[in-house]
């Protein structure tokens, strides 16, 4: 009778990750895989993960002070690939431990970081090389190409390589960058016969 008298309760669109109780209502495994993505162990509606800014803001409440989103977590923020189940962060100066995150310590320049919707995150190029380094040569090729489709370029990748930990033991990664994104001599320079050729770089970027 109360329902008839007052009508249904006001409904509001969900704009946050769903809690366990909410995700158990009207469950359908097939729809779950289409409508939700598991991030840090929680089901999140896909429409909240469409952009870099949305993904960065989703992780920001879990980000410890004075740290940056790093590694696979940063890769997901930039590309939307491989949602993290545990947050990986980087600390420049502080040395501390957090049970809820995987923390690494790096001394990196400001050029290797980006602010995404106000959330500090390692840059796309550095995230790509960290992923490629752990994935190996075969998968590393696809990772670099994916990074380029999301805005990375040869110059940025080579700069990031200079700050990559273990680069001296992983020269194959630099070779892979040069193989996939070779420097191209400008045709205008070739036409002038100039000995000091201007170098352009291949850029597969697209607007995000």
Predicted regions and their residues:
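Short gly/ser-rich loop at a beta-strand->alpha-helix junction or flexible surface loop bordering the NTP-binding
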Residues: 1-208
């Amino acid at each position: 009778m109360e329902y008839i008298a007052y009508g249904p309760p006001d409904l509001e669109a969900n704009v946050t990750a769903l809690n366990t109780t909410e995700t158990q209502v009207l469950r359908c495994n097939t729809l779950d895989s289409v409508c939700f993505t598991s991030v840090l162990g929680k089901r999140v509606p896909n429409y909240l993960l469409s952009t870099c800014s949305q993904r960065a803001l989703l992780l920001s409440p879990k980000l410890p002070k004075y740290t940056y989103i790093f590694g696979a977590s940063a890769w997901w923020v930039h590309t939307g690939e491989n949602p993290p189940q545990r947050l990986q962060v980087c600390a420049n100066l502080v040395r501390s431990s957090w049970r809820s995150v995987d923390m690494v310590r790096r001394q990196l320049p400001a050029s290797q970081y980006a602010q995404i919707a106000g959330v500090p995150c390692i840059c796309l190029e550095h995230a790509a090389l960290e992923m490629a380094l752990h994935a190996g040569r075969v998968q590393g090729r696809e990772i670099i190409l994916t990074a380029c489709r999301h805005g990375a370029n040869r110059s940025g990748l080579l700069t990031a390589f200079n700050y990559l930990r273990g680069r001296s033991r992983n020269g194959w990664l630099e070779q892979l960058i040069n193989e996939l994104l070779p420097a191209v001599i400008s045709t205008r320079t070739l036409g002038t016969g100039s000995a000091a050729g201007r170098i352009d770089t291949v850029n597969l970027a697209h607007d995000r």
